[in-house]
Design a protein with these regions (language model features):
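Residue-level detector of bioactive/disordered segments in secreted/extracellular proteins
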Residues: 5-8, 24, 272
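Beta-propeller-forming repeat regions
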Residues: 41-498
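Bacterial N-terminal signal peptides that target proteins for export
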Residues: 4-17
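Sequence/structural segment immediately N-terminal to covalent heme-attachment motifs in c-type
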Residues: 31-45
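Small-residue packing motifs within transmembrane alpha-helices
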Residues: 20-21, 60
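Bacterial Sec-dependent signal peptides at the C-terminal "C-region" and cleavage site
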Residues: 23-33
Length: 498
């Protein structure tokens, strides 16, 4: 087995027990240096440098800094001598002062007027008492597969949404991937954000109609398993998200032959985009890395690595898709970012969905669709006009000022996207979305999965006034709790609305 070295554009995460050790390099730095240079040097040791403008001043002060001090173990500095303590505190205070000085005040945020709800979709049915963690639509057999955290099982529904099959997993199914005649299922031991070896990859035979069989066990929060063939040999890519100990693995004929140790691998695609007969593996990575990686298979078994996109740690990548989004015959990369799990903060203007031109060397951004807190999206032709549209759900939406962004339809007209709330956007805290011809009438419908998984105040979240200013309104949470988590089915009515 080969353990890959880190791509040059990435830096390995530091596995250090406390802030004093993490900042120990400060003591060996000769002379004084500017606060900006100090911040760039030290913050870039673990991840890409986050510019001060990436968050408002109050978010740095009340959100990011308490979180980082807890993460780095600032309390442990008391175990060191007075000189070390003074030096480390002075440098840390200098870094914080730089960010507070260079970041902007939070402007007032008036509540936005909600745009008209999309007439292209209407509520068809609801499947109650489901903590939805994954959705897969089997178009050939008219079945919908749902990963349910509540029952820790894969539930299968027919077109009338009758539960026709249940695969007990005793784990939380989080991803489905159909490859040839197998429906692969990635499962976690729980939704708790902890490193664990309770994860599993298995598959359901006969394209999801047969029996469940485990394939790989003892995994650290697996998020995607993609099998493929190359030069007559069976390969597979496994993404283990983990928390601090995740990894990306390549299997050949069932044996692990290559490992890249990095946490946060969240999605994967295998394509031959340049039609040279050599497959390329694209992996989206979140956590502190926030990047898009490409592994190119070479004749003779070699693998070339490259970093196509690298963002700062507050970016929050959540999902990806690769297809020809604008009909120009070339594959585009669609990426969403909106995860703010680590600490609560105000909306970030760079959250949303971006379309990148894969044909350019620098992966140029072609379009940006703003959507705060976006967690998942699906691409579909909602109006049957030949233009590919996008539907998205935002788990971390701005529920105080723009609650309609929780579930949106982004309609493409003349190359631009117009945003419309989906019917029932306020009915749940949507975590997953999928599209497909659910009712068999020839046009794509939508499936929305709710998962109200509340995060309560953590030890480092101590400023009650700040927390009140960014928390989800109690009335919104009360509505979610009253309705319960569920699967919502939206029927395509675009033909009727014309």
């Amino acid at each position: 087995m080969i353990w890959l070295t880190w791509p040059r554009a990435l830096t390995p995460p530091r596995r250090l027990p406390g802030l004093a050790l993490c900042l120990a390099g400060f003591l060996s730095t000769a002379g004084e240096e500017t606060s900006e240079r100090l911040a760039k040097r030290e913050c870039s040791k673990c991840h890409a440098f986050p510019p001060p403008a990436s968050m408002h001043r109050v978010d740095w002060e009340k959100g990011a800094f308490p979180y980082l001090e807890d993460l780095l173990g600032i309390a442990q500095i008391e175990n060191y001598d007075a000189q070390t303590q003074a030096a480390v505190r002075a440098r840390w205070d200098t870094i914080k002062a730089f960010y507070l000085r260079q970041s902007d005040e939070k402007p007032s945020t008036p509540s936005a007027t909600e745009p008209p709800v999309s007439a292209a979709f209407g509520h068809r049915s609801t499947v109650e008492k489901l903590n939805v963690t994954a959705i897969h639509h089997d178009a050939a057999n008219g079945l919908v597969y749902v990963g349910d955290e509540l029952s820790q099982a894969v539930l299968v529904y027919d077109r009338a949404f009758r539960n026709v099959r249940t695969f007990a997993a005793d784990k939380v199914p989080c991803d489905f991937q159909l490859a040839e005649d197998r429906l692969y299922v990635c499962s976690h031991g729980s939704l708790d954000p902890l490193d664990s070896e309770a994860g599993e990859v298995g598959y359901i035979t006969d394209s999801g109609l047969g029996e469940y069989r485990p394939l790989l066990r003892g995994l650290n929060r697996p998020t995607r398993y993609v099998p493929f063939r190359h030069s007559g040999t069976d390969y597979a890519v496994l993404c283990e998200y983990g928390i601090s100990k995740g990894k990306i693995s390549l299997y050949r004929e069932g044996e692990s032959v290559l490992v890249l140790p990095m946490s946060g691998a969240i999605d994967c695609r295998v394509l031959d985009t340049d039609a040279d007969g050599q497959p390329e593996v694209y992996v989206l990575v979140a956590q502190e890395h926030e990047c898009l990686l490409r592994f190119t298979m070479r004749p003779g078994g070699g693998i070339a690595q490259s970093v196509l996109i690298k963002k700062q740690p507050g970016w929050g990548f959540t999902a990806m898709e690769m297809l020809d989004a604008d009909g120009d015959g070339a594959v585009d990369v669609l990426l969403s970012n909106g995860d703010t799990t680590e600490f609560r903060s105000n909306p970030r203007a760079y959250h949303g969905i971006r379309i990148y031109d894969l044909g350019s060397d620098d992966l140029a951004e072609k379009q940006f669709i703003p959507a705060h807190g976006v967690m998942d999206f699906t691409v579909l032709d909602a109006e049957a006009d030949g233009d590919l549209d996008i539907a998205s759900v935002s788990y971390f939406a701005d529920f105080r000022h723009k609650p309609h962004q929780a579930a949106m339809l982004h309609i493409r007209h003349d190359g631009r996207f117009a945003n419309q709330p989906l019917p029932g956007h306020e009915q749940g805290r949507w975590c997953r979305i999928a599209s497909g011809d659910i009712d068999g009438d020839g046009d794509p419908d939508l499936l929305l999965g709710a998962l109200n998984y509340q995060t309560y105040s953590r030890a480092y979240e101590r400023d009650a006034s700040f927390l009140r200013s960014v928390q989800i309104p109690r009335a919104v949470i009360a509505r979610w709790e009253r309705l319960g988590n569920h699967l919502r089915v939206l029927e395509n009515r675009a033909k009727r609305s014309r």
